Amino acid sequence: MQNETKPLCGIDEAGRGPLAGALVMAGVVLKKPIDGLMDSKKLTEKRREALYTIVLENAEYHIVSFSAKEVDDLGISKCLQKGLQSIQNALDGCKYLFDGNSTFGVDNVSTMVKADDKVPEVSAASILAKVTRDREMIKMAEIYPEYGFEKHKGYGTKAHIEALMKYDRCEIHRRSFRVKGLDEPTLF
């Protein structure tokens, strides 16, 4: 029997901490090396978009998304667990490396802190997850223009908190995420 090495599937997520929008996970198996891969947060939007297309053309991949309602109903950890399982099912027979320090109870997954900046497959997954999520938030900004999603992508910026105070939550806000001043009673 030949000693075949399993391909590496890099896995990362985007949207673990925002107040609005989906949690998006991606798994990527590169067919060939791609120059310029690194943690998506260190790339410009233009460079991320260019690399997104290159990754799609040169990799096997699976992207899974959990809506704000699913995040509220299941919790972040359960969504991450289900996402890892979905990626394993879609990209079978790989070694799986997830950025971070927890496998969320999923077998046959290794973890590495900052893998999105160290391992090309995880960098590619980081790019697919972030671009997918950012594009969705830009679409949501057209439906809910008062929140400015196209700018902050649902993260808890000052402008986003101010919009929440003025307009309250919309359909894509995570109700399980508490916002100071919105969810706590005030004295006045």
Swiss-Prot record:
It is found in: Cytoplasm. Residues 6-188 form the RNase H type-2 domain. The keyword Manganese applies. Its EC number is 3.1.26.4. A divalent metal cation binds at D12, E13, D99. It catalyses: Endonucleolytic cleavage to 5'-phosphomonoester. Its cofactor is Mn(2+); Mg(2+). Keywords: Cytoplasm, Endonuclease, Hydrolase, Manganese, Metal-binding, Nuclease. Endonuclease that specifically degrades the RNA of RNA-DNA hybrids. This is Ribonuclease HII. It comes from Sulfurovum sp. (strain NBC37-1).
